[in-house]
Swiss-Prot record:
The name this protein goes by in its record: Multidrug resistance protein MdtC
UniProtKB keywords: Cell inner membrane, Cell membrane, Membrane, Transmembrane, Transmembrane helix, Transport
Provenance organism: Escherichia coli O127:H6 (strain E2348/69 / EPEC)
Stimuli inducing this protein: The mdtABC operon is transcriptionally activated by BaeR.
Residue intervals passing through the bilayer: 3-23, 333-353, 360-380, 387-407, 431-451, 463-483, 528-548, 853-873, 875-895, 897-917, 953-973, 984-1004
């Protein structure tokens, strides 16, 4: 007894099996996490080190390079980049996908320990690391504002109480607090008052350090008691420092308040944060590479009431940005698309069968197959994301195909008068091999995807497995539940048609008759069809070469990031004004809901902005259209540029850039790099294929270069250390003492009062006390002159690097930009000492481009092997695969028509078409072979009869797949930019394939049959292999 006969005669067992599959799927669905895309984040670790006051070049040579040499030995590091700026170095390590982030972190700590002896002794702390990618957009931004508390106090609450608590939440990788710095006592010195009193800056520093100490004092005890000794050795507020005696002049006490202004302020006054034009402290939260964004955001939201309770009521804690609403909205759109696809597919079945009872059968088979897939997704550790749900949407057309083929064949026997159970057995027996061939060959398409490495392979694996599982369950259902329901539900008579549907039935009959007549003509003009087939192959090649290409569709996530790049010599005050101006322009745009931003720190001429757009339903423009509109307004702001880009769910690399794509220049000759980078950047800025061209090379910062006269210094009794200490004391925001509090430690910061450092003449007021106690002006032994200096020094590996970032103008693709850059580099004649290569997402695009054709060929070869094994033939698989060229032409023409570039999503569509369109040929070839074996028909008679008999199921399966994909094309709202390329590719390919393969497949079948007979050792045998 055949396998499926067991289920036909045991309906209860079959029903319970289907119920079990459905219940497991429902349970899996409830337990599946939610995400925008499959987990494709590279493991990234950021190492930070600081040496206050050190120049970028000093940080690069003395801090970055020793660390890089040690970190570069770690196994699994795929990319190492560093950026050194004033007083700080940051090294980004990107690891291979299969590298465990926790194991990598242990190796990073060991490498830091190994390099410790090579680092400068003056570093205030050891280098630290974080398991987060600083280039990723925050998953959530919290803001603190208050009308009563200062920015320093707000920063203290944020960094001391909120950030540590949030960091402990599962999934949180890093909490970056910006907008100010910790509270501090600031000592603003008056150089003239110091000179008048004969007090040096070192005297002030030493006096303050000696007056604020925290040392153990011991204890007193007798035979029965013990007394702990406690002194007032600490000064904690500006008021306590004000009367501090720092010197005696002619017997009179010189107090700190006599020569300085002492205030309760912050450690670094060159920091500013804002939200919607109001000063604010920002908590920018990033997730761990392996964390789920929705679960992490939900966990943070659940803790917000607790967090609010830990800070005073006068402080307002708000969510300024949250990535999760647009992700949820996108997934809801996909779920609605899935439901619409199921409804349309069932409608197609009903129109063709014109029987409510018969339609119930695939209407049951489809949900069982789709719902059952959720169980496998859970067991595989997948998530409900845009790609996995799109896989199920597309699977709707596939899973109904198997049921349609079985159902249609059984219905044909019923209409011929056969009894239901007998028809179920006979019909399933006839098409069982066909259904198996269709399903296995479709799954075979995805085998190369499962073996594909890198980011594309990780991204597509979840899609491929989800679809394959759905097809596998569909195969089981179509050979068990479907024939059982047919045998017990359908009647042995022609179904009654509703009057409304008779017209459709007559139209279908007329269409079939017309097809038969046209097929006869085609079979008599096979050479013309051969020319058409060869033409489609050539057209495929031309279209693939010419179509614009990109890595991944540009997403509208509802969030924009903006990088501010101002003149390299700009002051902090001017930069803060630019931030406010830019925020006002953006805040006034009707599509903008919220704006936050900050500037300052080690790179005064840069800033960041995070813009939340209104929900998609409340605005008519896409994110890119909004960027285009804002770009024109922002260009009118002098002295600085704001580069906007839409936040994407996929971002590769650890570089913090002001645009979406990067091109990196490397050289072992720093001078050559600095010479050629401006030339290359200016050339690229003229290209129409690129927009927002900018660079991270900043080597024209304003510098005042002091030249010591060492002979004069020796004669005057002054050493270089004393002179450098003078400059650090005066202008370096030097942290000279620590104030210990129960919750945190705060600094005493000393510098010349900003009122006396407004111009270069401030240097003339500086003096050093020599070893004879005399005040020697700085101008006696030093000269100064303005010069240029780098604001940052960047490395990749151990080579000097400069990264040029760019966005794409509307209507341009990444392939256009890549080709234009390659041409520009060739035209410029860049020397071999300067090497250029794409980085980040652009690099992955280049790698994917090189493997796309190989992947498609591998998929076709895999299908050929599977079909060859199933048919025990070298020839028939070629007949079946002859359907592919027309599908490729239709897909590529549709993409051109909709002005959609060929992306990774479109590649998925092409792979799916390889599996879909061959189903038509499989049904034709199977019936033709059966007719030749058992009907004693000639090959031409057999294929002609097969085409007519299978016309209805071919139309049904094609229209089911087409209508299953059509909602993807027509869908709007959040995430539509991901769904539409897939739908366009499939619909275009199906339409063109259906028009041509109904005629080309019979012709190819006859061609190979004649070829087989010609080379056969037994030419008299007329039966095919």
């Amino acid at each position: 007894m055949k396998f499926f006969a067991l289920f036909i005669y045991r309906p209860v067992a079959t029903i319970l099996l289907s119920v079990a599959i459905t219940l497991c799927g429902i349970l899996g669905f409830r337990m599946l996490p939610v995400a925008p895309l499959p987990q494709v984040d590279f493991p990234v670790i950021m190492v930070s080190a600081s040496l206050p006051g050190a120049s970028p070049e000093t940080m690069a040579s003395s801090v970055a390079t020793p660390l890089e040499r040690s970190l570069g030995r770690i196994a699994g590091v795929s990319e190492m980049t560093s950026s050194s700026s004033l007083g700080s170095t940051r090294i980004i390590l990107q690891f291979d996908f299969d590298r465990d982030i926790n194991g990598a972190a242990r190796d990073v700590q060991a490498a830091i320990n190994a390099a410790q002896s090579l680092l400068p002794s003056g570093m205030p702390s050891r280098p630290t690391y974080r398991k987060a990618n600083p280039s990723d957009a925050p998953i959530m931004i919290l803001t603190l504002t208050s009308d009563t508390y200062s920015q320093g106090e707000l920063y203290d609450f944020a960094s001391t109480q909120l950030a540590p608590t949030i960091s402990q939440i599962d999934g949180v990788g890093d909490v970056d607090v910006g907008g100010s710095s910790l509270p501090a006592v600031r000592v603003g010195l008056n150089p003239q008052a110091l000179f008048n009193q004969g007090v040096s800056l070192d005297d002030v520093r030493t006096a303050i350090s000696n007056a604020n100490v925290r040392k153990p004092q011991g204890a007193l005890e007798d035979g029965t008691h013990r007394w702990q000794i406690q002194t007032n050795d600490e000064l904690k507020t500006a008021a306590e420092y004000q009367p501090l005696i720092i010197h005696y002049n002619n017997g009179g006490a010189v107090r700190l308040g006599d020569v300085a202004t002492v205030t309760d302020s912050v450690q670094d006054v060159r920091n500013a944060g804002m939200t919607n034009a109001k000063p604010a402290i920002l908590l920018m939260i990033r997730k761990l590479p392996e964390a789920n964004i929705i679960q992490t955001v939900d966990s943070i939201r659940a803790r917000l009431p607790e967090l609010q309770s830990t800070i005073p009521a006068a402080i307002d804690l708000q969510i300024a940005q949250d990535r999760s609403p647009t992700i949820r909205a996108s997934l809801e759109e996909v779920e609605q698309t899935l439901i619409i696809s199921v409804a349309l597919v069932i409608l197609v079945v009903f129109l063709f069968l014109r029987s409510g009872r018969a339609t119930i059968i695939p209407a049951v088979a489809v949900p069982v197959s789709l719902i059952g897939t959720f169980a496998a997704m859970y067991l595989c550790g997948f998530s409900l994301n845009n790609l996995s749900l799109m896989a199920l949407t597309i699977a709707t057309g596939f899973v109904v195909d198997d049921a349609i083929v079985v159902l249609e064949n059984i219905a044909r026997h019923l209409e011929a008068g056969m009894k239901p159970l007998q028809a179920a057995l006979q019909g399933t027996r006839e098409v069982g091999f066909t259904v198996l061939s269709m399903s296995l060959s479709l799954v075979a398409v995805f085998l190369p995807l499962l073996l594909m490495g890198g980011l594309p392979g990780r991204l597509l694996r979840e899609f491929a497995v989800t679809l394959s599982v759905a097809i596998g369950i569909s195969l089981l259902v179509s050979l068990t539940l479907t024939p059982m329901m047919c045998g017990w539900m359908l009647k042995a008579s022609k179904p009654r048609e509703q009057k409304r549907l008779r017209g459709f039935g007559r139209m279908l009959v007329a269409l079939q008759q017309g097809y038969g007549k046209s097929l006869k003509w085609v079979l008599n003009h096979t050479r013309l069809v051969g020319v058409v087939l060869l033409g489609t192959i050539a057209l495929n090649i031309w279209l693939y070469i010419s179509i614009p290409k990109t890595f991944f569709p540009e997403q509208d996530t509802g969030v924009l990031m903006g990088g501010i790049q101002a003149d390299q010599s700009i002051s902090f005050q001017a930069m803060r004004g630019k931030l406010q101006d830019f925020m006002k322009i953006i805040r006034d745009d009707p599509a903008v809901d919220n704006v936050t931003g900050f500037t300052g720190g080690s790179r005064v001429n840069s800033g960041m902005m995070f813009i939340t757009l209104k929900p998609r339903g409340e605005r008519s423009e896409t994110a890119q259209q909004i960027i285009d509109r804002l770009r024109k307004k922002l260009a009118k702001e002098p002295g600085a540029n704001l580069f906007l880009m839409a936040v994407q769910d996929i971002r590769v690399g650890g570089r913090q850039a002001n645009a979406s794509y990067q091109y990196t220049l490397l050289s072992d000759d720093l001078a050559a790099l600095r010479e050629w980078e401006p030339k290359i950047r200016k050339k690229l800025a003229t290209l129409p294929e690129l927009a927002d061209v900018n660079s991270d090379q900043e080597d024209n910062g304003a510098e005042m270069n002091l030249i010591y006269d060492r002979d004069t210094m020796a004669r005057l009794g002054i050493d270089v250390q004393a002179a450098n200490s003078l400059l650090n004391n005066a202008f370096g925001q030097r942290q000279i003492s620590t104030i210990y509090q129960p919750m945190n430690q705060y600094k005493v910061v000393m510098e010349v009062d900003p009122r006396y450092t407004q111009d270069i003449s401030a240097l003339e007021k500086m003096f050093v006390i020599n070893n004879e106690g005399k005040a020697i002006p700085l101008s006696y032994f030093a000269k100064w002159q303005p010069a240029n200096a780098p604001l940052s020094v960047n490395h990749q590996g151990l080579s000097a690097a400069s990264t040029i970032s760019f966005n794409l103008p509307t209507g341009k693709s990444l392939s256009d930009a890549s080709a234009a850059i390659d041409r520009a580099m060739t035209q410029l004649g860049v020397p071999s000492t300067v090497r250029g290569s794409f980085a980040g997402t652009a690099q992955v695009f280049q790698e994917t481009m090189n493997s796309q054709v190989i992947l498609i060929i591998a998929a076709i070869a895999t299908v050929y092997i599977v079909l060859g094994i199933l048919y025990e033939s070298y020839v028939h698989p070629l007949t079946i695969l002859s359907t592919l060229p027309s599908a490729g032409v239709g897909a590529l023409l549709a993409l051109e028509l909709f002005n959609a570039p060929f992306s990774l999503i479109a590649l998925i569509g092409i792979m799916l078409l390889i599996g879909i369109v061959k189903k038509n040929a499989i049904m034709m070839v199977d019936f033709a072979l059966e007719a030749q074996r058992h009907g004693n028909l000639t090959p031409q008679e057999a294929i002609f009869q097969a085409c007519l008999l299978r016309f209805r199921p071919i139309m049904m399966t094609t229209l089911a797949a087409l209508f299953g994909a059509l909602p993807l094309v027509l869908s709007g709202g959040d995430g539509s930019e991901l769904r539409q390329p897939l739908g366009i590719t499939i619909v275009g390919g199906l339409v063109m394939s259906q028009l041509l393969t109904l005629y080309t497949t019979p012709v190819v079948y006859l061609f190979f049959d004649r070829l087989r007979l010609r080379f056969s050792r037994k030419p008299k045998q007329a039966v095919t292999e």
